Amino acid sequence: MMPQLETATYLTQYRWTLIALFLLFSFLVVSVLPAVKTNFLIRRSIGAGWTGAPKTSDLNKGPASLWSWDKI
């Protein structure tokens, strides 16, 4: 029988899948998303012609500030 279909290994496979997904999510939140946010804010400030450029404090706000629609 194939190991993917053995009921004895379901819990182990599920556990390792959850661990891998949690590690991937943590990596994205800690390293990838802040870099994307910084690049987005820099591009937005350059595209605004420095008239509507965000304040420096906008670069230090939490991740929720990127997704607020009133700033776009």
Curated annotation (Swiss-Prot):
Q: Where is the signal peptide?
A: none
Function, as annotated? Mitochondrial membrane ATP synthase (F(1)F(0) ATP synthase or Complex V) produces ATP from ADP in the presence of a proton gradient across the membrane which is generated by electron transport complexes of the respiratory chain. F-type ATPases consist of two structural domains, F(1) - containing the extramembraneous catalytic core and F(0) - containing the membrane proton channel, linked together by a central stalk and a peripheral stalk. During catalysis, ATP synthesis in the catalytic domain of F(1) is coupled via a rotary mechanism of the central stalk subunits to proton translocation.
TM segment ranges: 16-36
What this protein is called in its record is ATP synthase protein 8
Q: Which UniProt keywords apply?
A: ATP synthesis, CF(0), Hydrogen ion transport, Ion transport, Membrane, Mitochondrion, Transmembrane, Transmembrane helix, Transport
- Family per similarity comment: Belongs to the ATPase protein 8 family.
Would the keyword Transmembrane turn up in this protein's UniProt record?
Answer: yes
One term under GO cellular component: mitochondrial membrane
- Any Gene Ontology biological process: ATP biosynthetic process
InterPro entries under this entry? YMF19-like_N
**For this UniProt entry, what is the primary localization, expressed as one broad class?**
mitochondrion
Q: Does the keyword Ribosomal protein apply?
A: no
The encoding gene is MTATP8
Topology class, membrane: Single-pass membrane protein
User: How does the annotation summarize its subunit structure?
Assistant: F-type ATPases have 2 components, CF(1) - the catalytic core - and CF(0) - the membrane proton channel.
Q: Where in the cell is it found?
A: Mitochondrion membrane
